[in-house]
Amino acid sequence: MSTPQKTAGGNNAYHNFYNDFLHIKDPNERRRLALAEVDRAPFGWYHVRAVAVAGVGFFTDSYDIFTVSLLTLMLGIVYFPGEGKMPTTSDTAIKLATSAGTVIGQVGFGAAADVFGRKSMYGLELLFIIFATLAQALASGSPSINIIGIIIFWRVLMGVGIGGDYPLSSIITSEFATTKWRGAMMGAVFAMQGLGQLAAAFVMLFVTLGFKKSLEAAPTLASCTGDCAVAVDKMWRTVIGVGAVPGCIALYYRLTIPETPRYTFDVKRDVEQASDDIEAFKTGKPKGQPDEATRIVAKQEAEKEMEIPKASWGDFFRHYSKRKNAMLLAGTALSWCFLDIAYYGVSLNNATILNVIGYSTTGAKNTYEILYNTAVGNLIIVLAGAVPGYWVTVFTVDTVGRKPIQFMGFGILTILFVVMGFAYKHLSPHALLAIFVLAQFFFNFGPNATTFIVPGEVFPTRYRSTSHGLSAAMGKIGSIIGQGAIAPLRTRGAVKGGNPNPWMNHVLEIYALFMLLGVGTTFLIPETKRKTLEELSGEFDMSGEEEAQRDTTLTEHKTEAPTSSAAVNA
């Protein structure tokens, strides 16, 4: 076996890409060769670290988003005594608040990350989330302001931070990822959403068990007053407050993550810094340390010679005035929008749906059993459906491909919602629960994962974060439509003492229509597996012959590199 060559400044563990290509003067060629090394790098601990840093933040996002159905249930008990539930308008407003803030964060942080850099924004959005989460847990009403209004305010602010995390986590992961496993890495980050949902269900279960004695005293939610109401008040504050813990753990690592080499190459045009940042990432350092004089000269040359267009408003509109690029953005944005209409319409109403199908209330003798059944029901949905769906995507997305998974997911979800909607009155509660669990599985082994992954791959570096943010924002606009306009229709025609959700079957039928529309928009997106980000975005267009030539060039340059490096060091 031949001994692998080591370039100056490298070792067996950490290869020095900077010295590999130090002798190459053309900044475009250095960029291509250095990024090829990133794309071809074997999967290592530095990739695991990138996924973990992005994933812990996404875990926090998911926990905070999906505790809302539990939050509104408990707020209804505490602040609406005698009724046991809050008005539908208040329930909807709290759920919409996070989505409204998320739209702002996705567009704002997405654009800012393209202007100021990924590193500059990463961590700032997490500060929003941590602060707003703690503020919610400590919130209290007063004679002059209602607790519902206070919660809505803080959830909007929290949503801004959550929104910023979508484009940043996706883009940073994709730009650091090896081409072969980029889908799995991005899918693993997104799969933390399932673990966040699972954690929310477990925390709810534990606090319910902890206050069992106080909760058992009230036979119904409406009669939960006194010690029972105090217990529920402590419960919702605990459930919300715990969401700040993983964010605090992830904050340091986000603030110290290096800038992505692609951004430094293509937007900053800082060739020397980007080359050193690649090495810094692999060694766990926050930033590369190139020679400052060499860096300044190289940057000046790159400004003149780089083939990649400079980012500007004019270039942005020129780029998306081309039909191909506009249709691509429409494909990612509309697919996400149609998905979230149904996904958030049902997922943020898990507690309501469990109640509708009788799972949480049937046979329940007191408030404790209702809340316990709700927590266990959420655990069943997440463990049996959501979590497996996420991880099946992680293990198949780089072999099956993004587009087939999205087609399959939308298609099967259309069928499941048609069955739930049109056969709603003929299905038993257990059958409805089983179909609902299947729907959660195919949301996540389907478009919920792929709509996050694809926008992080197909757009050029200079507009990648903005475009991902716009796509994600359309998704959250869809969730606002699903929660604000469609989900409340379930109460249409309700009479006091009767079925509180007589229109639930028609709501599910409407969701089926949007899943069918998602099948159509999937035709607008390309297959992205095993292709470099530059191939997908058209930043350089390689045929098979050109790619083979590039591989030959890469080998030749790396063979020459030790000699050149030695000359530099001499």
UniProtKB/Swiss-Prot annotation:
Record membrane topology: Multi-pass membrane protein
Region Disordered, residue ranges: 537-570
GO biological process annotation, one example: phosphate ion transport
InterPro entries named among the record's database cross-references: MFS_dom (IPR020846), MFS_sugar_transport-like (IPR005828), MFS_trans_sf (IPR036259), Phos_permease (IPR004738), Sugar_transporter_CS (IPR005829)
Coiled-coil spans in chain: none
Bias-annotated ranges (Basic and acidic residues): 547-560
Subcellular localization, as worded in the UniProt entry: Cell membrane
Induction: Transcription is controlled by the phosphorus-acquisition regulatory system.
Assigned GO CC terms: plasma membrane
Positions on the Cytoplasmic side per record topology: 1-61, 117-120, 165-186, 259-325, 396-403, 455-468, 527-570
Keyword NADP appears in the UniProt entry: no
Lipoprotein as UniProt keyword: no
Sequence ranges of Polar residues compositional bias: 561-570
Described function: High-affinity transporter for external inorganic phosphate. Acts probably as a H(+)-phosphate symporter.
Protein name: Repressible high-affinity phosphate permease
UniProt source species: Neurospora crassa (strain ATCC 24698 / 74-OR23-1A / CBS 708.71 / DSM 1257 / FGSC 987)
Taxonomy of the source species: Eukaryota, Fungi, Dikarya, Ascomycota, Pezizomycotina
